[in-house]
Design a protein with these regions (language model features):
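Active-site microenvironment for binding and transforming phosphate-containing groups
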Residues: 1-232
Length: 234
C-alpha cells in the first residue's frame, strides 16, 4: 500500500493511483477528533459516536481528496451479501428512503462521478473494485459470513449484468483485515466454508499447537474474483 497523505492518515494502492479519473482511500484510526472506542478518525454514522465528530471527520476526509466529492455513502452493514447501486434512481428518493435503502447492504456500486461509495471494516475484509473500461466502482464488506455467502462473486455478477463488466477489466484491491495467522475459528465456521463450496486446502490450516483451524479470508475472497494476479492488490 502507499500513503495518500503526508502523515499516512490515508492509505491507497499503486494499481488504482494510476487512474486519475477514480479516487480511492483506506482510512486509519489517526487524525480525527473522535475519542474513546471511536478514537480518532471514525467516519461511520452507525455508531454511538456524536454526529458532530463524524461530520467533522468526514469533512477532513473530503479535504484530503484530490477529487471533488459531492457526497459520501456508507451502508448500514449486516454481514450479508446484498448490494446496492447508487444511481439516478437512488438520488430521486427522499433522504429517509435513501437511509432505508442503505440498511442491510454490504456492498455499494456506482458509475456516477462525484459520489463516494464506502464500507467500514475492522477484522472484516474490504474489497475495492474498479472496472477501468466501464468506469464503475464498488466497495465490498466481506466478513466471514459474507464470504461464506460469496459476496464478492455476487457483486461481480451484478456488475456484469448491470454494466457489462468483464473480469479482465477489473482492478481489485483487498484491504487491511484479519490475517490467516490471527483468524482462529471453531468447527462450525470451518464447516460453513466447506459446505459453501470452498476448497479448504486452499484457504485454511490447522495449528498443531492448538488443534484449531485458521481461515485465510484474503485468499477466500481472491479466488472469488475472476481477476488475474496482475490486477489484484492486497
Amino acid at each position: 500500500m502507499i500513503s495518500l497523505t503526508k502523515h499516512n492518515e490515508l492509505k491507497g494502492y499503486k494499481s488504482l493511483d494510476v487512474y486519475p479519473e477514480v479516487a480511492h482511500f483506506v482510512t486509519t484510526r489517526h487524525e480525527g477528533i473522535s475519542t474513546g472506542a471511536y478514537g480518532s478518525f471514525n467516519c461511520s454514522p452507525y455508531t454511538n459516536d456524536s454526529c458532530m465528530n463524524v461530520n467533522r471527520n468526514q469533512s477532513w476526509l473530503f479535504q484530503c481528496m484530490n477529487h471533488q466529492i459531492k457526497e459520501l455513502f456508507i451502508p448500514e452493514q449486516s454481514h450479508g451479501c446484498a448490494s446496492l447501486i447508487i444511481n439516478e434512481s437512488f438520488f430521486k428518493e427522499s433522504l429517509e428512503m435513501r437511509r432505508l435503502l442503505l440498511r442491510g447492504m454490504d456492498a455499494l456500486i456506482t458509475n456516477v462521478p462525484g459520489y463516494c461509495v464506502c464500507v467500514t471494516t475492522a477484522d472484516c475484509v474490504p474489497v475495492l473494485l474498479y472496472d477501468k473500461k466501464q468506469h464503475v466502482v464498488a466497495a465490498v464488506h466481506a466478513g466471514w459470513k459474507g464470504t461464506v455467502k460469496h459476496i464478492v462473486s455476487n457483486v461481480m455478477d451484478h456488475l456484469n449484468k448491470m454494466f457489462g463488466t468483464q473480469g479482465e477489466d477489473v482492478i481489485a484491491c483487498i484491504g487491511p483485515s484479519i490475517s490467516l495467522e490471527s483468524f482462529e475459528v471453531g468447527d462450525e465456521v470451518y464447516d460453513a466454508f466447506e459446505e459453501s463450496g470452498f476448497d479448504m486446502s486452499l484457504i485454511s490450516m490447522k495449528k498443531k499447537e492448538t488443534g484449531k483451524y485458521h481461515i485465510d479470508l484474503w485468499e477466500a475472497n481472491r479466488i472469488e474474483l475472476p481477476v488475474s494476479y496482475t490486477h489484484l492488490r492486497a
